[in-house]
A protein has these predicted regions:
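Surface-exposed, low-hydrophobicity beta-strand/loop segments enriched in small/polar/acidic residues
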Residues: 1-158
C-alpha cells in the first residue's frame, strides 16, 4: 500500500478490500504443501482437497479451469506466502480491487487469466471470480470487483 503524503489517502492495490471496512475474511487458511510457488496478494485461489488437513482450509493458486474460492488479501507485513504459510482469503460477497487485463465495463461477469488479472470473458468450462463494479479503460488498471466465484457452464453439445 502507498500512503500519499499530500492528502493522506491509501492508494488501492491488487487484493485490497474496497467499499466496506468490516467484510468477512477467511482467516487462517493454509497454503497447500503442493503449491510450487509463493502466493501473492491478489492471487486467485481454489481449495486443494487433495492436500487438505483436518479442520484447515487448504488453498492453492487457481488455474483458469478451477472453481475459485476467493482472492488472497493484501497483507501490510508479508508480501508472499509459501507452502504451509497461513493466508487470509477474500471470500464470496466481499468487494476488492483487482487488476484488469483489458477494457472492462462495469456489470461484466469476470473470469481470470493465468496471470491472475480479471477479464470480461465467458469461456466455457472456465472459472469466474465475480462482477465488475467499476470500468477499466485500459489494461493494468485497478477495478472494484464483487467476489462471486463460480464456473462457466460447459458448451452445449450440438
Amino acid at each position: 500500500m502507498a500512503l500519499s503524503l499530500t492528502n493522506f489517502r491509501i492508494e488501492p492495490v491488487d487484493g485490497m478490500l474496497a467499499l466496506l471496512p468490516n467484510q468477512p475474511i477467511l482467516q487462517g487458511c493454509q497454503v497447500s504443501s503442493a503449491q510450487p510457488t509463493a502466493l501473492n496478494a491478489g492471487d486467485i485461489v481454489t481449495i486443494d482437497g487433495t492436500n487438505a488437513k483436518q479442520g484447515i482450509i487448504t488453498v492453492k493458486k487457481a488455474a483458469v479451469t478451477d472453481t475459485p474460492l476467493g482472492i488472497v488479501l493484501t497483507d501490510p507485513i508479508k508480501t508472499s506466502f509459501a507452502a504451509l504459510d497461513r493466508v487470509s482469503v477474500i471470500p464470496v460477497n466481499c468487494y476488492c480491487y483487482k487488476t484488469a487485463n483489458a477494457n472492462i465495463t462495469a456489470g461484466s461477469k469476470l473470469q481470470f487469466t493465468a496471470e491472475g488479472k480479471v477479464a470480461a470473458t465467458s469461456t466455457a468450462s472456465n472459472g469466474y471470480i465475480g462482477i465488475a463494479l467499476t470500468n477499466a479503460t485500459a489494461a493494468d488498471q485497478l477495478i472494484i470487483v464483487q467476489v462471486q466465484p463460480g464456473m462457466e457452464p460447459a458448451a452445449a453439445a450440438a
